Every structure is written in structure tokens, then in C-alpha cells.
Amino acid sequence: MDMEVKTMPGKISIPRRFIFSEGKAIEHPDYPHYSNLLQKMNMPSVKGLEDRHNCVRFEKKCNPTFLKFHPYPPSVLPDYHLHYPYPPPYGRAYPLAPLRDDVPLGDPCSGFMSPGGDANLKPNIGRAIPNLVSFHDVKPQNRVPRPDKGFQTTIKRQTILAEELKQDRRWNSRKVPDISIKAKLGGWTSPMKVVPVPVHEHEVGTLSRIYTFDEEAISTDDSEPLVQLDKKYNIKDSFYKSSTQKAYEDVPWDKMLPPKLDPEETTVEKAADHISQCFSLKRYERLPAITQMVGGLWDRFQTRLFSAPAKPINFVSPSTRSKYIPLYTGHVQSTDADNVDNPYGDIKSVASPRHSKLQYTNSSRSANIPGYTGKVHFTATHPTNSNIPSREPSADSEMNRLLLQEMRVDRFRHQGPMSQMVTTVKPYNPFNKKEKETLEY
């Protein structure tokens, strides 16, 4: 097919191959499938198609690819606005240059959104990009994530976060929580009014007792002398005093103790199993990770030690369309054999992993539980454990029994060459059932 443009007066004809020119320049069959995943992962992208660093971006003059670059066809043509394909107007789909639609929006150095990509998306168009200035230099570990829905919950969490940041988070033994002060003053620490439990009479005497400490005690109630270990020892020194509290404050508890645990975002359990009451996550994920679906380009940019045991590292699946686990060496099937090599072919029809299913058991006829492996007659319509009265034998059952015994075939049929051999000398053939005949002369 001629690759040049065939121009006719008043009409532009474009070869059919250029309509699918994107598949022409792609050598790797999985590139169109993981190119979108690379943008989500902020992976450093190569320049140009086919990883050639834009060395083949120069096209011939009058190439139909340049029609997409111009916002409108030349106005000298009659009915230029009716020609196909009509180039897109200025906007998100407007290309920057011929064959350069894959413009990376992320900065390859920092990994964040580049200023050019931020300006290209424009405000109020497409996906909203969060502004980093609105967080007021809050550390990531102190930032409260936004819930999926609920505007009032977001404002409440931001208010709590602002109050916690203003407070001194260092350990202080003299600090008294506000909730304890409210409890001592008789205030309510809960939104609902709590009615105190009445005290019984036998507990009043116990609560009203006052225990005193007698330092000068010499003997116990049993008139036994106390054992004094040391005269210099003072029992009141073991009390908790302000000096003891001051000594504890000198200890760097913030460095010795683990940090305070922040409350969870939600109390919803992850992957809760209501049958086994096992609240652990599943061992195997249902779908492969994004890093396992981007092809060999992940290993290309992944930094590893030079002392790696095996190279290349087969960490990802060789085909992103097969949806198989990495290191899978089986055969990827498809309804059409040509779709395996076609980058736009459909191989998901039969490439999904198989799941073992129980064999179908017709329980409506045999009345047995599914998966029963006992002995049941193939024409029986009753369960095996049902009590069925035995029938009387028929008149010809004895005759059938004799016929079966006569028709019974021996297990060892002696069909081998040694068994069929006939010997005329002793000990003769042990399998020869012919009777011996005496010949008279």
C-alpha cells in the first residue's frame, strides 16, 4: 500500500494503515496495556516510541500524521470542516508535536507533578490535583487522611489535628488530663447523664474507715516484737514525694518509650471472615499487584545490588494481558491463535486462572448428598441408608445362577506361549486338560 497521501481536488484520502499507526510503531506487545499503569506509579518514562529517544520522530513531508498536529485543515480546501479525520480542537487531546502524545506529567527527579503538567491539566479540568500548600507543612505521620465521604467528619478531624499540634507532646508527669479534672469536680465525662450506683449499708463502714500510719510502733497486735533491719531506715522515705517525681522527669521517656499510637481511621475490619472468625488478611491476593503487571520495564528501573544471585530477575509476569502470576511457564491460550501475537488481541477469554469445582451430582434422583462415593445401583432412586424390604427370589434365579457359574472365566486364562506348549514327557504340561489315552498295538 502506498504510504503517501493521495490528494484529490476537494478531498483528503488517508491510508487505512495510518488510522492504526499507533500499533505500527510498537514492538513490545504489552506496551499499550501497561503504559497507563506506569503513569500511576510515577515511573520514569523513556523518550519517544520504541525507546529510541525520538530519533524517528521526523516524518516525510505531507505525512498524514501532521494532520493531527494542525488544529484545522487548510482553509483553501472546499468544505474543509467535513473532512475525516477531523483534528481535535485545542484542549487536553491537542498534541504538542507529531507522534508525541505520550508527554509525561510527572517530574522524573522528584516524582511529583511537574509545573508543565500541572499547567497542561488546567484547573477544573480532569482529575483534581491536591495543593501541597494547604497542609501548612504538616508532617506526613501527623496528617489525618480524608475519609471517603462525609464533609463534617473531615472538618472535625482537621480541628482535632490542629489542637494536637498546638499541644506539647512531650511526656509530663505533672500534667493532669481535662477529663480527670471534670470527674473530680463532678462534671459529666460522657454525653449521657450517668446515675451513680447506690452504696449498700455493709460497704459504708468499709469506705468510712481511716487507716493511720504509726511510725513508732514497737510490737504487733499479737504482742510479737517487730524486726528492725536498720535504725537509719525511715519508712516514710518509700512514699512518693515531689522529689521522686522530679527525678522521674529527668529521665528521657520520649526516647525510651514508643510514640503514642494514633486512633484508627475506621473500625471496619479488613477482610473479616464471619464463618471462621479469623480477622487476618487473605494470604493470596485476588489480582496481581501493579508492579507485577508493567512488564520488564519495572526491572529496568529497579535498583538492585550488583551481587544479585540471578539475572535477569523475573519479578513480573512476561505478559500483562494474561493475568497470570510471575514465573508462570504455562501456555496462554485464546480462542483465536493470532491474538497471542497481536498487541490488541483478546486473550482474556480463556486465559483466566481455572477454579476447581465439584462434579455435578444429581441429588434429585439418587437422593444422596453431593460428593457421596458409596455404592448405589445406577437405577436406584432411594438413599443408600433406607430400609427397603428384601424381595423373594424368582423361580428362574437358580437357573441363572448355574448359567453364571458355567460362564465364569478363569482369572488366569493361560494364553501365554509357555502355557500353550504341549509336552509328551513327564511331568507333562500341568495346564493340559486333555485326558490321557492308552494306545494298544
Swiss-Prot record:
Transmembrane segments: none annotated. Keywords: Differentiation, Spermatogenesis. Disruption phenotype: Mice have smaller testis and show impaired spermatogenesis. GO terms for biological process: cell differentiation; spermatogenesis. Signal peptide: none annotated. Testis specific. Expressed at the spermatid stage. Essential for normal spermatogenesis. This is Protein SPMIP7. It comes from Mus musculus.
